[in-house]
Design a protein with these regions (language model features):
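Substrate-binding N-lobe of the ribokinase-like
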Residues: 15, 19-86, 296
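A structural signal for isolated positions on well-ordered beta-strands in alpha/beta enzyme cores
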Residues: 49-52, 75-76, 129-131, 160, ...
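Conserved phosphate-binding/catalytic loop of the ribokinase/pfkB sugar-kinase fold
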Residues: 76-82, 89-124
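Gly-rich Lys/Arg/Thr-decorated short loops/hinges at beta-loop-alpha junctions or inter-strand turns
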Residues: 13-22, 93-106, 179-186
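Short acidic, glycine-rich surface-loop motifs adjacent to enzyme active sites
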Residues: 127-139
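Conserved post-catalytic alpha-helical subdomain immediately downstream of the catalytic base
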Residues: 212, 237-296
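Positively charged, low-complexity intrinsically disordered leader regions
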Residues: 1-12, 297-310
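Conserved phosphate/ATP/ADP-binding segment of small-molecule kinases
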Residues: 137-231
Length: 310
């Protein structure tokens, strides 16, 4: 996925229709979705292998160009004859005026499906954890997800998934999923606003879908981590928010690193909250840097910097 930002100004209303005239001044293009998770992991020094599918179009070419910037990583990219996904945001004085999306949500073909399975089986033995970023754009069918989860469990490799599919049967038997508040509420048909409600929703998801851990991202209310042993809630600090796009990707990256390194749950959530707070304070999709994450001399800094392969 490609995240595009067009910065400009509006000084007048169009004579053609009652709409503002946007004068473009600057453009920026960065990886979004799974690409943003990948960038966050690489930024923190994690050796990461990316397996993905893009379209044979200009957006796909730009995605490949951005991926080439990360040389200390592996990339397996299948190019399919379909439209790549992009989100173009037009901003005036830091405020989003409109977002224009381009996408094709049709399921990938048999060749792309086989490509993913082939390289997944090849790479999983070289890595300590699997991270799936499911934006529901046609790559992760229930069949493919079930296959990837089954392979991960057979290899005893933890698999962490950021879900967008409303059918959570697709994520059965996964190690950890990270739904947001809305997704959690929709799948359980319950309110999940308070800590107690979030805990109850997490337990329902775990029991119904045989998922070992649930991390609910609750925006300004923080994070709730639920497993069979305990439930931990981590609140956020009040900060000025400029742009929430990509914050969930950053949380996914941090939690994956901490999980792979057996970091204490409470500290893992504090790190994830801190990282998310850092990126929402910037305009546009951005990544967390080591110096931002560890500037307060967190006690596990040495252990976390000795990060594993994802």
């Amino acid at each position: 996925m490609l995240d595009r930002y067009v910065f400009g100004k509006v000084n007048r209303v169009s004579p053609e229709a009652p709409v503002p005239v946007f004068l473009s001044e600057k453009k920026k293009e960065v990886l979004g979705g799974a690409g943003n998770v990948f960038n966050n992991l690489v930024s923190l020094g994690v050796f990461t292998t990316l397996i993905t599918v893009i379209g044979s179009d200009a957006i796909g070419d730009e995605i490949k160009k951005n991926l080439k910037k990360n040389k200390k990583s592996n990339k397996h990219i299948f190019i399919e004859k379909k439209k790549s996904t992009s989100k173009t945001r037009y901003l005036v004085n830091g405020q989003q005026l409109i977002r224009v999306d381009e996408e094709n949500k049709n399921e990938i073909g048999k060749q792309a499906y086989s490509f993913i399975l082939k390289f997944f089986k090849k790479e999983i033995t070289k890595h300590d954890i699997v991270v799936l970023s499911d934006y529901n754009k046609g790559i992760f069918s229930t069949k493919l997800l079930n296959s990837l989860i089954k392979i991960s469990n057979q290899k005893k490799t933890p698999i962490i998934i950021d879900p967008k599919n409303k059918n959570f049967d697709a994520y059965k038997n996964s190690t950890l999923i990270t739904p947001n508040l809305l997704e959690t509420s929709q799948v359980t048909n319950l309110n999940c606003d308070t800590d107690k409600e979030a805990e109850n929703c997490g337990k329902i998801i775990m029991k119904k879908y045989k998922i070992k851990n649930v991390l609910i991202t609750r925006g300004e209310k923080g994070l709730s981590y639920i497993n069979h042993k305990n439930s931990i809630h981590s609140s956020t600090k009040k900060i000025e928010v400029f742009d929430v796009s990509g914050a969930g990707d950053t949380v996914l990256a941090i939690i994956s690193i901490c999980f792979a390194n057996n970091i204490d749950l409470k500290e893992s959530l504090n790190l994830a909250n801190k990282a998310a707070g850092s990126v929402v304070g910037k305009i546009g999709t951005s990544v967390i840097k080591k110096n931002e994450l560890f500037k307060d001399n967190i006690k596990n800094i040495n252990k976390i910097i000795n990060i594993k392969n994802l």
